[in-house]
């Protein structure tokens, strides 16, 4: 795998997100608080890990990082917008990343895998989103692997 972006704890590489070699992976991806996951990478998560993933965000708000467990796999739904058709803000992206970090630290979780969040269907500039990830996780011991095709 060719590495495109490497920080001390943040690695970006080309490859299928779902082909990682980890027996108990922890994923994170962006969703809306209305629970609609009918397109993009969210649809792939639902197809692989079940329809319960969509209902897991009920009652949560923008800025939350909502965990969902399926067997040995954990998925953090980063709620970055209210409705599936809206676009996230950089503030909501940063808030959900901070919530993710807080949950990972609290649960002694040291690794998370994610796609290039908010830059596909949500249309955010990847360089700016990547800077938010770096701002939130810089200096932490959490290893982040970002995969893209």
Predicted regions and their residues:
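Macrodomain-like recognition of ADP-ribose-binding/processing modules
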Residues: 1-149
